[in-house]
């Protein structure tokens, strides 16, 4: 693999020499940083099994190497990378996999280690969504996830990735993560804080990542991280699990933040060692039981992961003085809910008791039951999935609901050819050789739901959302 030139400030190199364990070679560290990052993907088990995904992609000649800490994760090598971007493959467009850096799969592996099965989880800094979607897959779309993102521009990307992966158990918020300890005390079984950091571990992806690096900046970031972990710890229930992670390498933003929390709440913080998380984890193990992953150890990004347990309650923070405002939704009454469920089933949309129907004006939504305890305590940017809009003739089913809820075995399912599927993703109407019988058609490709179409004569009217329409080269290689 070709080398690329990474910018290293002298003070950073000095700091890394001091931080690196004697068992590791500093020259190996420098050499690893100069190598471009290996591409990696995670199979979305909400949509397909790993075995079925491997069978589906076998004809492509992709080389898929298992990632030791994530059984759904693979490093990927492709001969056709220049001809077709990974994000334009049919399997990516239909949500069968997520392009995710291997080391960023570690925090969720730690969160669910040792049989941990949380029912209400918070992802404090969630965009662009790799870890939220990984958590949802581990929970099998059950329970509830609060996915928060402070950056307004990234909330939209977060929602798009959640929708593409067919996730229904997520509520989105847009706050500074420091508010949750006061706003939602002891409300979560598990919390992931993948903290904003100095990004020292990402130089293999971005050779200029350290252009603005300074020791002073590390200290400022660490101060924010301490406030974030303190807030998250307050929001965690007694007995719950907190995973703290960064994509940086200095101790100030990593071990020191966790040690500060333990010094602050000595009787409530227990470090849970990660040496048995996967075979070979001990190569990155610190004396505290954290994983401090230098890039040469597993040939991935630099990363840090710590797992903590809250052993007892801690004094509550002052109750916030802000007003949440009126919640604009109301539960759907039983009789109407039965009608909606029957109408939805007729086009192949079904859901279980983890979701409940709510309405706002002419909109019908499905919210995860596990999030209802938070209503009135925090303002949501988006909650659950929008199922339908009502109109004179019935319901206008929404694309995100089709992707999350549709069964490809429904009698109205209509399988497209590769060329027809590509036309669909380009936002064009489809003219199949043999038109389906039903008026509302569940459009599938590779036996995966990709949308809902209206049959008008021999034409399938495209309903693919305009903001998702793709240009350029797609999977049939026709631009």
UniProtKB/Swiss-Prot annotation:
Swiss-Prot/TrEMBL catalytic activity: cytidine(1407) in 16S rRNA + S-adenosyl-L-methionine = 5-methylcytidine(1407) in 16S rRNA + S-adenosyl-L-homocysteine + H(+)
Residues that bind S-adenosyl-L-methionine: 125-131, 149, 176, 194
GO cellular component entries: cytoplasm
Places the protein is found: Cytoplasm
InterPro entries associated with the record: Methyltr_RsmF_N (IPR031341), MeTrfase_RsmB-F_NOP2_cat (IPR049560), MeTrfase_RsmB-F_NOP2_dom (IPR001678), Nol1_Nop2_Fmu_2 (IPR027391), Nop2p (IPR011023), RCMT (IPR023267), rRNA_ssu_MeTfrase_F (IPR023545), RsmB/NOL1/NOP2-like_CS (IPR018314)
MF-aspect GO terms: RNA binding; rRNA (cytosine-C5-)-methyltransferase activity
EC number: 2.1.1.178
GO biological process: one example: rRNA base methylation
Broad class of where this protein is predominantly found: cytoplasm
Pfam families given in the database record: Methyltr_RsmB-F, Methyltr_RsmF_N, Methyltranf_PUA, YebU_pre-PUA_dom
Assigned keywords, A-Z: Cytoplasm, Methyltransferase, RNA-binding, rRNA processing, S-adenosyl-L-methionine, Transferase
Residues at the active site: 247 (nucleophile)
Top-level taxon of the source organism: Bacteria
Recorded coiled-coil stretches: none
Keyword S-adenosyl-L-methionine among record annotations: yes
Family as reported in the entry's similarity comment: Belongs to the class I-like SAM-binding methyltransferase superfamily. RsmB/NOP family.
Record PANTHER family: 28S RRNA (CYTOSINE(4447)-C(5))-METHYLTRANSFERASE-RELATED, NOP2 YEAST -RELATED NOL1/NOP2/FMU SUN DOMAIN-CONTAINING
Function: Specifically methylates the cytosine at position 1407 (m5C1407) of 16S rRNA.
HAMAP family referenced in this protein's UniProt entry, alphabetically: 16SrRNA_methyltr_F
Name of the protein: Ribosomal RNA small subunit methyltransferase F
Gene transcribed to yield this protein: rsmF
